[in-house]
Amino acid sequence: MSVESSSSAVQQPPSSSNLPLLGDNQAVATTSSASSASSSSTSSSSSSVGGGNVVGVPLDTQGSGEPPAKKQLLDGGGGGATSSSGSSLLSSAAAASGMHEKLAHRISNALCCAVCLDLPKTAMYQCQMGHLMCAACFTHLLADGRLRDQIATCPNCRVEISKSTASRNLAVEKAASELPSECQFCNKEFPYKSLERHEQHECQERPTKCKYHRIGCQWRGPYHETNEHERNCLHPQKSGYEVMAALEAHDDRIKEEKKMFNTLIDLLSYEKIIFNDLQMKPYRTDEYVHKLFYETARFSAFNQQWVVKARINNSQRDPHQSNERTITYQLILKTKTSTPMSIHFFALKGPFSDMKVSTQIYKHEFTETSTESEYYVLPLPDGVGGSGSSECNRMLANKGINFRLLMFLLNK
């Protein structure tokens, strides 16, 4: 963050023609005549103006011809004067920093989405009247209109919106990408467009594993401590027998991933596959203790109406008192079905989302009596401390959670 500051220039003594008018009892210092100045470098002249005695200021004729106090200030000395100047600079820098933050905040408010009040992370659309909507909210409004069998409208001015009438606002997208955003690891600010690269490859505080983690080292810490740890790591000195357990656990994880991907390949061969780009918004229960939960609007899939619901720490009474945080979600059938429906589903990052989530496929058979799946863990990547709490906190800090839901219907 650059701070522009201007140092106050030392003013030159006014010429005799620009001297201010004096009262009867005021005195002004004047220089001696040219002849007396040349004869003595340290002489001072005295004159009387309005009856007052005036003492001349000695000049440094061997140097720059400036008064000593002024010469000392120009040379960088001055003791108290320098301290005062430094304090003034710090005050100016602090004031400029505060103005910069306020300006960034005002610009953020002007460029935010009219629906979720968040800055755009992908494309930004506008209605015919110029009201802004991020891509996620824009598609959400269009989907709501389709479900209600109504024409979608702008939430601000109620003008009709559609893919043909709304247009992208590239200027807003460009401006939003330049706004400062805070790194979740080092808390420094970077332009939003370069934040992801910084967090993944440049940040010295980003969580990193030891390069010997495959043979059992469980260390995980900031990147700048990696070299020191690896120099002192004891795992390279262990025997093959000692690291066999870690290698077997690593092989088991590889087998599980291979099994999951094989399952996904089989699911992609199904006849009925559908995906929806959804947005979960926060709500509170009506209980005495209002618990937080997230829920999407209704969406259509396989000629049925569905909802996705999520909760934090399995609806723990006081989740704010826990350092470990998880998100679990369930798929709910909102319409009646006469035949059982065997559904495979999983959540993943969508085109309007910056959510970091691993792939985990779940299955539930929906019937007339079983319209809600169990709550399944939303697998978030490990952060600081080896858990997904940091990613969970980042998602909870947003106005909503955008994601894509893939669903596969098994024909029987």
UniProtKB/Swiss-Prot annotation:
Keywords: Metal-binding, Zinc, Zinc-finger. Residues 1-85 are annotated as: Disordered. One of its GO terms (molecular function) is zinc ion binding. One of its GO terms (cellular component) is nucleus. Gene3D superfamilies: Zinc/RING finger domain, C3HC4 (zinc finger). Residues 1-17, 29-48 have a biased composition (Low complexity). PROSITE patterns: ZF_RING_2, ZF_TRAF. A zinc finger (TRAF-type) spans 171-227. A zinc finger (RING-type) spans 113-158. Belongs to the ZFTRAF1 family. This is Zinc finger TRAF-type-containing protein 1 homolog.
